[in-house]
Amino acid sequence: ATPANYCALLEPSATGNQEITKSYFIENTYGIGSLIVDYHRITPNDCMIIISNSGNNIAPVDAAIRAKEKGIPVIAITAVEYSDYLKTKHKDGVKLKDVADIVLDNCSLIGDAAVEIENFDMKVGSTSTIPNVYLQNCILTQMVEILVERGFEPDVYYNGHMAFMKEDCADHNDKLVDKYFYRIRNL
């Protein structure tokens, strides 16, 4: 189950999922992070979670700076030791962890790789993927718990497979899609 008002802002050209060499240029271009915050109309009623393993590239730092300018709380998920090891690329001399309101350390290794292969000079095997997903899920579950404790009923989608086990799941999810359709661009 996922909160209905949780929106992943996955800018394809910046994620490295496609055209990985292009992502290097995008994540190190001034203005991209600010543009993403402005384009998605993020407001102070929202909270922005920015994930950058090194925390040193320009776009995530710019996104955090722009969010803070707009009064939006920022949570950073980053590898603190790795970030400290590297020099920031940002002209203001700041890193993501310096700008964020809350920093969650994914404890990823320097270089984001752990496995040594015999006769190969480079380590492989990311150490950030699983902790990043885990930390996001911790944030989401804590958010739901806090809202319930304060007397709110959070909007949470049922897992799609639950429609086969509980009659009103599909209707429940459809109502949430209708509620957030114009607010969340990737619905």
Predicted ranges, named:
Residues A1-L140:
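Glycine-rich phosphate-binding loops that contact phosphosugars or nucleotide phosphates
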Residues K22, P154, V177-D178:
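Generic intrinsically disordered, low-complexity segments enriched for polar/acidic and small residues
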Residues I42, E145, E149, K179-Y182, ...:
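A structural signal for alpha-helix termini and helix-coil/disorder junctions
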Residues D112-E116, Y134, E145-D171:
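Internal, active-site/partner-interface "lid" segment
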Residues A163-L187:
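Acidic, Ser/Thr-rich low-complexity intrinsically disordered segments
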